[in-house]
């Protein structure tokens, strides 16, 4: 079970704090970022924010000042004094912005994948239609296991990461029907 350091939700129209909603299953978008250090830094923050905003437009959740609202909520909730090694999740639907912070788990070397026949809805977006994946992940020790998302006998990604296969100095990945993560895009740009 995941332990959260922070869970907050805000009404999008006026940024009033409301009871926390994780928004899983809703029509919306999320991003998960590694926040580390003191003072805190977020790995690839500009890329995550840009991708989140582009995806929100595609999902027709295009509110004025949404970027500033996100930054305001983060500044209000993240401590400049805390030493972080956490995962920060921002989730947005048409009415709500939710943020949560959980400890970053370090994967063990002897890692395994449980193959699960599952098709993600609109996999090119990091959307909130993630309940089936979460139901599998919640039954596992995520430092040792993840799921492999398989559809039509093809392996596309894991429940938490992209897949990269390397052979003879060439990188192989699925061609389509998977979410291209920010870290994946970074590595792809370096090859």
Task: Go through each PLM region and give its residues.
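Short secondary-structure junctions
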Residues: 78-86, 142
């Amino acid at each position: 079970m995941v332990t959260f350091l922070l869970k907050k939700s805000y009404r999008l129209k006026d940024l009033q704090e409301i009871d926390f909603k994780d928004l899983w299953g809703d029509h919306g978008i999320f991003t998960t970022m590694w926040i580390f250090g003191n003072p805190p830094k977020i790995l690839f923050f500009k890329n995550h924010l840009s991708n989140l905003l582009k995806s929100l437009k595609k999902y027709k959740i295009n509110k004025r000042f949404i970027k500033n609202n996100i930054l305001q909520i983060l500044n209000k909730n993240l401590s400049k004094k805390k030493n972080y090694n956490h995962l920060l999740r921002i989730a947005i639907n048409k009415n709500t912005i939710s943020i949560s912070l959980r400890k970053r788990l370090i994967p063990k070397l002897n890692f395994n994948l449980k193959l699960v026949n599952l098709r993600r809805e609109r996999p090119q977006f990091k959307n909130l239609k993630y309940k089936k994946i979460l139901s599998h992940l919640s039954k596992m020790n995520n430092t040792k296991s993840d799921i492999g998302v398989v559809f039509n006998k093809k392996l596309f990604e894991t429940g938490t990461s992209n897949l990269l296969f390397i052979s003879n100095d060439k990188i192989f990945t699925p061609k389509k029907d998977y979410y291209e993560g920010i870290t994946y895009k970074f590595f792809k740009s370096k090859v």
